[in-house]
Amino acid sequence: MIDTRRWRKPLRINIAALVLCLCLTACSIRQTGGSLPDESTDTTEESELSGELIDDTGESEPVPTETPGKPGVTAETSTESFTEPPAETSTEEMTEPEPTEPPLTDAQVALIEEADRLAAGYDYDAAMALIQTHEGFAEVSAMTEALVRYENRKAATVKWESIEEITHVFYHSLIVDPVLAFDGDEDEYNYNRVMTTVEEFKKIMQEMYDRGYVLVSIHDIAHIEVQADGSEVMVPGEIRLPEGKIPYVLSVDDPSYYHYMEGDGFASRLVIDEMGNVVCEYIQPDGTVVYGDFDVMPLVDRFVEAHPDASYRGAKGILALTGYHGVLGYRTDPAYQNHQGLDAGQQAWLAAHPEFDYEKEIEEAKRVAEALKASGWEFASHSYGHRNYRDISMHDLMWDSNTWRNTVASIIGETDILIYAYGADINGTSPYTAENERFMYLKEMGFDYFCNVDANRYFVQLGDNYLRQGRRNLDGIRMWQAISGQKDWLSDLFDAGEVFDPERPTPVR
């Protein structure tokens, strides 16, 4: 009897080899158009899907394949082997890739950001002009897109048709600490009537902004044009704003920080900080000196920084200055140097400051004034001695006006704006004429804009060679009148009940 166990494994190997040979032969015949003989059939399974042979152990082995077009040369069964070669393409049919624009430089980014800020403040022409100062701006897509954007926004603005319907609001120096201001002394009464607290001012600014109010310069309302014959004519300006925006003028009376206000919770002067910003110096009750946004000027500056659309072309407001205690908190009046005609407040201040340097005081005041003007503020005369120009003699009016020019304009620069002390207009509400001696003298002194006090929403009078505008006091007495039911003069601007500082003594009389 034959022992078949010793043949089993070699037989299996031979069958696998036979099948492999048959497969190779079949491939060769197919390429030459032949056919397989009948004996090619075998009990060995061939996977039609995988291209693998399965031997009788159940294990699969890859089927070698030939490279297409090259009989007898085997290749891996990767799909990459069967990828069609790319079609030939002539150089005429190939297109050049479009050049990629380089990223913006830091300088270009800064330029566009500054132009965007100008446009946010409605100065579209200045924004476009700034972009066009960049060499090659037309090749920078971000810049050309900005120009289109500014042009479209400019086209969407509308002209404010009636300059007679532009309101003017004003404040005095703001109360920083109501506890000190309303301490029951002799000054509390006036502080409560005619002053506004810092917190009230912040709320008023925000609510007016929310209602669409935009700061404008009084020079935007109207301006002087010199005619061919040399005569001057005041002509209306053109204010263009987006639909729904409302222009208004702001002014501040007496930011000179008088001696009587010392220790009563007000700032003591304006200074320039390390960033070049105008801020307030404030002396706390313990004598500690701190700096910050404690009055109208720095508060408006910060507000406009955060909301560029709150200001038309950078306008801020008008600072109405006297001169008898100096300007902006600096003791610049000649009396501080020559010690002539000193009042009690001046004497006490000089005694407390033996290191006082008059020339340095003048220099610092000029620096602050220039910084204010550069940031959009304008100056006005408020008379030298806070005098009533309607009631004083013509002689005294002339002396006061000349003294203001010599002691104040010499520091802050010339101005064409006069804001009457006490709101006392030289001619009531009647138009100015050449027969009015006071008006003609003030015109000779260079004044073209004249502002009184008027509680009504609007008082704007365009004369042949002047502009008059009434100003509305946003202070304790007006707010109290509104919330106590007497008369609400302020409802078009803000809700007095939401603004009124609870630390104020009431009633406000």
Predicted regions and their residues:
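Sec-dependent N-terminal signal peptides
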Residues: K9-C21
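Metal-dependent polysaccharide deacetylase catalytic core of the NodB/CE4 family, i.e.
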Residues: E164-G184, E188, M234, L241-Y248, ...
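C-terminal motif of bacterial Sec signal peptides marking the signal peptidase cleavage site
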Residues: C23-A26
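N-terminal secretory signal peptides that target proteins for export/translocation
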Residues: M1-K9
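C-terminal active-site subregion of NodB/CE4 polysaccharide deacetylases
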Residues: A119, D125-I221, M234-S251, H259-E262, ...
